[in-house]
Amino acid sequence: AARLNDGRVMVYGSMGGDGQPQTQAALFTRYILQGVPLQESISRPRWLLGRTWGQSSDSLKLEGRFAPACIARLRELGHDVEVLADFSEAMGHAGAIVRHPNGLLEGATDPRSNGAAAGY
């Protein structure tokens, strides 16, 4: 959870073993620092460095929606890159809710899983 200087309160999380902190850091960075809309912050392509639940390799795993030039460049730099499905469950499932200062609740859910954001 995070209480921001502008009055927003954000709760967010993900499942996904050792990938959880990577997913949560990406989600927070996209939404708070880069100003990406909440749902898009969760839906954008993900990466995972190392092993996570159900995975046996320590490679750099990228969802297939990354640009081919990006994937090629990472390989040129010596990374062991493994390209997964466009929306891979190996990247975990994330969700977030933001309460804005005016009381508006904004929710987002992961297209990699079944779920919905609902509030009242």
Place the predicted regions along the sequence by residue:
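Proteins synthesized as precursors that undergo proteolytic processing into mature forms
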Residues: 1-87
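Cofactor-centric catalytic regions
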Residues: 65-120
